[in-house]
Swiss-Prot record:
It comes from Squalus acanthias (Spiny dogfish). The lineage of its organism: Eukaryota, Metazoa, Chordata, Craniata, Vertebrata. There is a cross-link at H240-Y244 (1'-histidyl-3'-tyrosine (His-Tyr)). Fe(II)-heme a binds at H61, H378. This is Cytochrome c oxidase subunit 1. One of its GO terms (cellular component) is mitochondrial inner membrane. It is found in: Mitochondrion inner membrane. It catalyses: 4 Fe(II)-[cytochrome c] + O2 + 8 H(+)(in) = 4 Fe(III)-[cytochrome c] + 2 H2O + 4 H(+)(out).
Amino acid sequence: MAINRWFFSTNHKDIGTLYLIFGAWAGMVGTALSLLIRAELSQPGTLLGDDQIYNVIVTAHAFVMIFFMVMPVMIGGFGNWLVPLMIGAPDMAFPRMNNMSFWLLPPSLLLLLASAGVEAGAGTGWTVYPPLAGNMAHAGASVDLAIFSLHLAGISSILASINFITTIINMKPPAISQYQTPLFVWSILVTTILLLLSLPVLAAAITMLLTDRNLNTTFFDPAGGGDPILYQHLFWFFGHPEVYILILPGFGMISHVVAYYSGKKEPFGYMGMVWAMMAIGLLGFIVWAHHMFTVGMDVDTRAYFTSATMIIAIPTGVKVFSWLATLHGGSIKWETPLLWALGFIFLFTVGGLTGIVLANSSLDIVLHDTYYVVAHFHYVLSMGAVFAIMAGFIHWFPLFSGYTLHSTWTKTQFLVMFIGVNLTFFPQHFLGLAGMPRRYSDYPDAYALWNTVSSIGSLISLVAVIMFLFIIWEAFAPSGKVLSVELPHTNVEWLHGCPPPYHTYEEPAFVQVQRTYF
């Protein structure tokens, strides 16, 4: 029965598919919101109303893309589908908890959309800073609904994290050490540890905000001895690891895609890749105040956060050059996933360079809350995380579905998307350097040219999204069935055919390990 299969599923493949469909749907909602933003900013003057409605759209766009698109697709979708297959486990460690992790997300999204729909909406930005998020500036239920939405999404992520950590550590064949698992599995492990350590801090912060709003506490109100800066510290202690949570599974997917289409049996520098991910995970927790250079910290505090932030570039550079070394000397197959992966490597590096610029606290005083910051994080998210998702999706789509995507169309779609996102976000560097601030619905005429260019870019990206939907629809034609699988022995997830049977590894996998002595 379909209801039993999809609503009460305990199968990692079905739950992974649910996550992918949910993420695709949320991604379209988030894209629609982003187009409203770019329509408002396409020329000087007002289109939609006042700054409140504009900021509600901006806030909803951020939350939808982060919590309901990137995380469900990368961790819930690819993680659920691939981790058990890659380590030879019959399923996840806690299959019913896995189901609950997914089904907490639709109500969470519903609460978020409700928060935008009631009263005046939550026009706080995704950071939800008090006093703007307090009950004076935001009277009504909007911010409270957004807080509850975050609580549900957070519980979902914590449960999923416990599940993945347990699965990856305990459900490998005994003969396999952790240092023989694929890099995607490592990336999910590091990501879920980050989630488990950072989300409780966010929960604490927004719970205190909830009581400040409704129970007359003063955690963040100076009138009662509180401090709004405390909220910023708590939020960014979660918020900075969160941005690494969004990109780390992408690192894992890119490692697999680059190795596969370079004709290599493994990525260059496996151990270096693993340690780099662990280093990024650790360093991600000790740089949070670089989001707060403008709150008036001591010069020595700013010096520390500047240098600690720059140190993260080292393990990141290790990964970038290892990907390039994997490509070197390979027998390259120029298929669409590799194009996405190459786009990822280049554009993620550009985003990383603007990040190094922003790490300088003295420069950041000037660039903070300008479009330079928007350009920076959209290069690493809209062209890092999204490109990784596209590379992984097109690469593993035959595994998930048993059907192949049309090669020429996916290549065309890559080209359109590549032009669209770059045209959207590259001009924003110029706007930021010229001093245009974020989160305003209108601007002086001097900024009109690059804003118009940026908005045209967003329409090109929209065309690419619609093309992608058509390509997926077209793939399910009977002519597109997968007939054979290449290289299953170095890519263990393909071992069971396309698509794999409903239950894999019903008896424990037989593993013969060749001992290597380091």
